[in-house]
Amino acid sequence: MDFLINKKLKIFITLMETGSFSIATSVLYITRTPLSRVISGLERELKQRLFIRKNGTLIPTEFAQTIYRKVKSHYIFLHALEQEIGPTGKTKQLEIIFDEIYPESLKNLIISALTISGQKTNIMGRAVNSQIIEELCQTNNCIVISARNYFHRESLVCRTSVEGGVMLFIPKKFFLCGKPDINRLAGTPVLFHEGAKNFNLDTIYHFFEQTLGITNPAFSFDNVDLFSSLYRLQQGLAMLLIPVRVCRALGLSTDHALHIKGVALCTSLYYPTKKRETPDYRKAIKLIQQELKQSTF
């Protein structure tokens, strides 16, 4: 409907959340030229770069991220107000709401699949918790997608294979004769690199128990940046779990690391009760399930 939301704001928010001109054109139902013109105009007005164009993707600048954080709550409020006071006789568009920590690559994959299928949706991103999910699914025409597991009476979990699995980095001083000293590992905190927190822990628990003989690993889910995590690893203060693809991208040596295979990223889909469920929901959920199952992270 967009009678309250400024066109420039909607384009900016959409580009921030899709990271792609091609996906944004499908979401907004306009061609690429007007999108480029709006962003170029904004950059001239603000005298600051908003995006760096690289290999077909848009990388937000720090300036753009600052603006996004400040205006997103305003955008969400206006959008909700439009939905509330809009014409009651018109079927509301299905909303797909992504948890703000959901991996960008899978987010773009889902958006692209929904767009190609012709499913009319409104894409949003926001921080969620169990209470927010409950409220959204009681009052909105939406599906909430998160890599975090919250209690909700209507939900399902999809698993996406993690390409190459993950590497468990162990402090060098814990190795004896080329093998990790199990006795020294017990009780050592296990840190998660960003993104690894959302993996299915059953597989990782099983690896610790079967391979290392550790039945109760000291997992730490604190938000620690990669530099600090690597420093603690080097000092022998912690172990570290990092996806294989990240190890390759960073060029990390895996001489003192163990490979954990068969790891999957868990995606939880939250949606309204069956009384409020519509064919649009079933179609979208089935499509998302298929896409996540066939893909790798």
UniProtKB/Swiss-Prot annotation:
GO terms under cellular component: cytoplasm
Coarse class of the protein's main subcellular location: cytoplasm
UniProt entry keywords in alphabetical sequence: Activator, Cytoplasm, DNA-binding, Plasmid, Transcription, Transcription regulation, Virulence
Domain HTH lysR-type: residue ranges: 1-61
Subcellular location: Cytoplasm
Keyword RNA-binding listed: no
Phenotype of gene-disrupted mutants: A disruption of this gene is no longer virulent in mouse infection. 20-fold reduction in cytopathic effects in human monocyte-derived macrophages, loss of actin depolymerization in macrophages.
Domain of life the protein comes from: Bacteria
GO molecular function: DNA binding; DNA-binding transcription factor activity
DNA-binding region: 21-40
Cross-referenced PROSITE patterns: HTH_LYSR
Further comment found in the protein's record: In Salmonella spp. the spv gene cluster is encoded on a highly transmissible plasmid.
The family this protein is said to belong to: Belongs to the LysR transcriptional regulatory family.
Job description of the protein: Positive regulator for the plasmid-encoded virulence factors SpvA, SpvB, and SpvC.
Protein name: Virulence genes transcriptional activator SpvR
Organism placement in taxonomy: Bacteria, Pseudomonadati, Pseudomonadota, Gammaproteobacteria, Enterobacterales
Gene that this polypeptide is encoded by: spvR
